Structure formats: structure tokens, C-alpha cells
């Protein structure tokens, strides 16, 4: 199976080389790797140039004005090939065997829209936390906030493109916004509970982290859309999920 790896990059001079090399060290796969420089103002472009010079057939670099991570992901998606796509944030890294294992799991599981992976969160002060996925199906995992995180998962290209890709103006809840569109069209998932990704929590956080009101509004509106969809299905299977969504929305 052909796998694409898209690495959005913005001012990640301390991390990006480790991210790229973690992809190069994957065994059993030869991914199509594209790094998208999203208008970096630090040494990120120079480091990417050096990596391309080192292995020109194993990395391509796209450059664009700063438009945000989702726009960079979509740009990389459009320029790569592969049945499944790994979106790797440039401050994260993959552990050995992650791509081959999840690709094989996808084949065995009937090619779901997403392989949900386990990961380890690491903070600058040395704290760590391992996060394992769980859930009986796509919607229960969505409602239970058990859909991994961007870098831990493997995404089916055809489903991504059919859903319209990443929503570029979505400032928070980005993974869950995309997943809800995939699942509305009947997408299924499979869980990979083997640790496959290191997710680094950068000390300065993200732009959206300080927008508490906006984040809460997006959180509630997204759950309202999912509740409406599940209610329209008129299935007893979803009664408990709908009740849980109402609790999350403070209803």
C-alpha cells in the first residue's frame, strides 16, 4: 500500500529534522513525503532545504504564505499520492513501525476511513502521558473523545477528498470537525493500541489556545451538528450517545 506523509511546518526549527527523520526510519514502507512550509520566519526553510539535499528522492518541500496548519495539510494532500495519508505535525515524530503496522491493520479491517492510533504526550517539564484509543464504533469514539490525535492517526485519502479535506477556517476541534464529516457518510474506524507517535506539547501553545470563548462555541456547535445527525437516524443504538452529547452541551 502506498502511503503519503504530509508535514505542515511553521517556525519549527527545533523539531522538524527529527520529524522528517522519524518518517525516513519507518520500515516496510516507502512513503511519498511532502513538507509544507507555511511561511516560516525562522530557520525551518533552510533546514528543509538541507534535508532535501541529503535525500532528494525522499522529501519534497512546498512553500506558501502563512495560512494555518489546515491549509498546509490540504496543500500537501493535493500534491501527494497514496491510498492512506499520515499528517505529521512537525513538532511530533513517529516511532518505528508505525506506518507499516497501521497500513496492514487498515487492509485487514476493510480499509476504514481512519486508523486511530495510540500516542505519548510529552511536556517541556518532562511529564508524559500515554493515550490509548477506545470505542465500540466511530460515533461512540467521537462522542467519547477517543479519536487519537492528528499525528497518531492514518487517514484514507479517498474519504478525505470526498469530505472536502480539512476545514481551513476551523481554529479548534479540527480533527473532530473532519471526523464528523467522514462519519456522516458512513465511515468506519479501527483502533491501533500500539504506541506509534510522540506528540510534543510546545511551551508557547497555539494561537487558538487563548480563545476560550471561541473554542467553547466551536465545541458546542460541532456537538449540536452530531446530535442532529444521530437523532435523524432514529436508531436506538444512539440514544445513550445523544444523551451524552446533551450533557457535553450543558443541555
Spans of features found by a protein language model:
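A conserved acidic beta->alpha catalytic loop
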Residues: 22, 37-46, 65, 89
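Glycine-rich, basic loop-to-helix element that forms the pyrophosphate-binding segment
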Residues: 64-80
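Conserved donor NDP-sugar-binding/catalytic core segment of glycosyltransferases
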Residues: 97-129
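Acidic metal-phosphate-binding loop of nucleotide-sugar-dependent transferases
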Residues: 92-93, 170
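Conserved nucleotide-sugar donor-binding catalytic segment
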Residues: 117, 135-219
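Short aromatic/hydrophobic "clamp" motif used to bind/position activated sugar donors
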Residues: 85
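Short, acidic, metal-binding catalytic loop of nucleotide-sugar glycosyltransferases
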Residues: 21-30
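Acidic helix N-cap motif at the loop->helix transition within catalytic regions
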Residues: 14-17, 42-51, 93, 97
Amino acid at each position: 500500500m502506498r502511503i503519503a506523509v504530509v508535514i505542515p511546518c511553521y517556525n519549527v526549527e527545533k523539531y522538524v529534522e527529527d520529524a522528517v527523520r522519524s518518517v525516513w526510519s519507518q520500515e516496510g514502507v516507502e512513503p511519498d513525503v511532502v513538507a509544507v512550509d507555511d511561511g516560516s520566519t525562522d530557520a525551518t526553510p533552510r533546514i528543509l532545504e538541507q534535508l532535501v539535499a541529503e535525500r532528494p528522492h525522499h522529501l519534497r518541500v512546498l512553500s506558501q504564505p502563512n495560512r494555518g496548519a489546515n491549509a498546509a495539510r490540504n496543500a500537501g494532500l493535493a500534491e501527494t499520492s497514496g491510498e492512506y495519508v499520515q499528517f505529521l505535525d512537525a513538532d511530533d515524530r513517529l516511532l518505528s513501525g508505525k506506518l507499516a503496522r497501521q497500513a496492514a491493520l487498515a487492509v485487514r479491517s476493510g480499509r476504514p476511513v481512519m486508523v486511530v492510533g495510540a500516542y505519548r504526550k510529552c511536556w517541556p517539564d518532562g511529564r508524559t502521558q500515554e493515550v490509548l484509543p477506545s470505542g465500540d464504533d466511530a460515533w461512540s469514539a467521537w462522542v467519547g473523545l477517543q479519536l487519537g490525535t492528528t499525528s497518531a492517526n492514518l487517514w484514507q485519502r479517498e474519504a478525505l477528498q470526498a469530505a472536502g479535506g480539512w476545514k481551513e477556517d476551523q481554529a479548534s476541534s479540527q480533527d473532530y470537525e473532519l471526523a464528523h464529516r467522514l462519519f456522516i457518510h458512513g465511515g468506519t474506524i479501527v483502533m491501533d493500541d500500539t504506541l506509534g507517535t510522540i506528540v510534543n506539547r510546545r511551551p508557547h501553545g497555539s494561537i487558538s489556545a487563548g480563545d476560550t470563548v471561541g473554542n467553547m462555541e466551536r465545541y458546542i456547535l460541532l456537538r449540536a451538528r452530531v446530535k442532529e445527525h444521530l437523532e435523524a437516524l432514529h436508531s436506538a443504538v444512539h440514544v445513550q450517545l445523544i444523551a451524552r452529547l446533551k450533557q457535553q452541551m450543558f443541555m
